[in-house]
């Protein structure tokens, strides 16, 4: 029976290679057998495959690879234990799988504060008697959502949230989807502190108004670091303008649903949990607070097996979550919404198809 172990390892190798060659998402894993722990050999092999998938390399200084491997093992154990419970969502080996939870939190420390909101709360989407909202909405199917983007290690989620909301609105109003420049916001919208501060989408919307629009991603591409504002580029060739912006009434998921039925909406969430860090698929209803520290965009909503959810676009590339998206439980018992998703919702306004 000496051939059994090599055969098993060959099967494991082929399974993991298949997973790594599949469309990008948080890495799926071969299940553990009967709840038993994985062997060190298996974990080391998965770690090497994960490193290859994410282009990870480590220096030998101060035992960095050993520390990262230990973090990876801890996260893999956490994933296996969670997925064995058959809860409403699954975890996987995201790009953060070699980090401790504290390192993950420190990577994007920005914290948009609801008290910093501009006084732009509107009753535009407050529910009215007789309202009949669609049971489900998915702006991706309407061609109003560009491909998933990646903010890298720059704390620029606010810029990606702003841009995605404006891209979607422009498609709805003009019929044209244009990928816009987050880098212009990072470099030129100084009040939001680029990669280093707690940017707000409202402030970025106001910048677009003052700046007479925003350039395309093609003409002002993303660099992942904060640079000097290219004033020449920033004041010419504007491809999209907006007229105003408004805030959804805070702590009101029904108003938020009505807003999303009309357009993609920028939101803030609390992303600090290990479950959020390692989210892979299905409807997330896991632990999280309401101390907002990350900006995303709701691009739709729906229901599945009696559970309502939001379709939320992230800016961590396609190897996190469900190809870059997360479904967050909707109509949560707390009016702030799960992870505070109803606390800081806002959207741009465009009154005509002209971008002049």
From Swiss-Prot:
Signal sequence range: 1-26
Record's keyword terms, sorted: Disulfide bond, Glycoprotein, Hydrolase, Protease, Signal, Thiol protease, Zymogen
Annotated EC: 3.4.22.-
Residue ranges listed under propeptide: 27-132
Annotated function: Probable thiol protease.
Xref: PANTHER family: CYSTEINE PROTEASE FAMILY C1-RELATED
Protein name: Probable cysteine protease RDL6
Organism: Arabidopsis thaliana
